[in-house]
Amino acid sequence: MTLVGPHRDDLVIEQEGRVLRDVGSTGQLRTAAVSLKLAELATLREASGREPVLLLDDVFAELDRERQERLSVRLGAPGVRQVFLTAPRRDELPEGLALDVFEVRDGALRPAAVPV
């Protein structure tokens, strides 16, 4: 067990002077977490000069439609080249998602028959 290091630190995010963890909705907390992940992506890209792979598991869960659509646009933006995200059901993906969509059926990965 390690007793010191960045993994032992707490990060406090505030919104309008209040701690988001204490007052934020589930969607706001999820949005903050995704925002940190996108900032990490930009930092890694800048530091390495290469495009990192972005892995997001069930990222649209607990986000309202507006937040889903804004994130969808951000993920399809120029410069974001390698994004892998999962969703348990196809209807949980926002309409117009500008990414290639694949599905796993019978243990095989294949392009989705119907675009989102």
Annotate the PLM regions.
Residues 1-55, 62-66, 70-82, 91-100, ...:
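Conserved NTPase motor "head" modules and their coupling/switch loops across ABC/AAA+ ATPases, GTPases
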Residues 87-89:
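Conserved H-loop
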